[in-house]
Amino acid sequence: MTLLNQYTGIVIPINISNIDTDVIIPKQFLKKINKKGFGKYLFYNWRFNDNEGKNINKNFILNDLRYKKSSILLTRDNFGCGSSREHAVWALMDYGFKVIIASSFGDIFYNNCLNNHLIPIILSENKINTLFDITSNYIDVSFTIDLKNNTILAKNYAYYFKIDALHKFCIMHQLDQIDLTMKNEKKITKYEKKIFDFFIKK
């Protein structure tokens, strides 16, 4: 298993606040329960001018070929607000995003990100402004996310961010909740032997 200590990717700036989950992926595309295939519906109503997805909105930054390989999304406050659909995270990841940087997130969306290993980073508004300034001066600029040291490296700036230690461990070691449980299987079995039988559902 490769340990994920750092990640470097091209940044795409979407300078809009309060982007809700219905904007991230509209409700008509929520008919599947696996995590694959949702990327083509990401920001669907912004990327296309029609319901069939044939008339491309050339003014939307995701359709700018210079950002085709972007994997870090820089945005504003309250990203992922609205309904709790986990499909929003799946769509972002399936499209190719690894990191979302914002000044705040919808609470449920934030936890869904962590559980799916999409890294949500919260920075102050002033720091977000600085990062937007960088992206306006440099097209297809790259940021480095140093998970080990909880730091964003952007040009001449280094910003510290907070992340829950357990979720950070799972992301760095590429473990989901089941994997984490299985790593503690011996401890769980040992504990089960110490408690009364009627506490354990047979």
UniProtKB/Swiss-Prot annotation:
GO terms for cellular component: 3-isopropylmalate dehydratase complex. Coiled coil: none annotated. Its EC number is 4.2.1.33. Pfam families: Aconitase_C. Keywords: Amino-acid biosynthesis, Branched-chain amino acid biosynthesis, Leucine biosynthesis, Lyase. InterPro entries: 3-IsopropMal_deHydase_ssu, Aconitase/3IPM_dehydase_swvl, AconitaseA/IPMdHydase_ssu_swvl, IPMI_Swivel, LeuD. One of its GO terms (molecular function) is 3-isopropylmalate dehydratase activity. One of its GO terms (biological process) is L-leucine biosynthetic process. Pathway: Amino-acid biosynthesis; L-leucine biosynthesis; L-leucine from 3-methyl-2-oxobutanoate: step 2/4. It is an enzyme of class 4 (lyase). It catalyses: (2R,3S)-3-isopropylmalate = (2S)-2-isopropylmalate. The keyword Amino-acid biosynthesis applies. Heterodimer of LeuC and LeuD. Belongs to the LeuD family. LeuD type 1 subfamily. Catalyzes the isomerization between 2-isopropylmalate and 3-isopropylmalate, via the formation of 2-isopropylmaleate. HAMAP family: LeuD_type1 (MF_01031). This is 3-isopropylmalate dehydratase small subunit. It comes from Buchnera aphidicola subsp. Pemphigus spyrothecae. The lineage of its organism: Bacteria, Pseudomonadati, Pseudomonadota, Gammaproteobacteria, Enterobacterales.
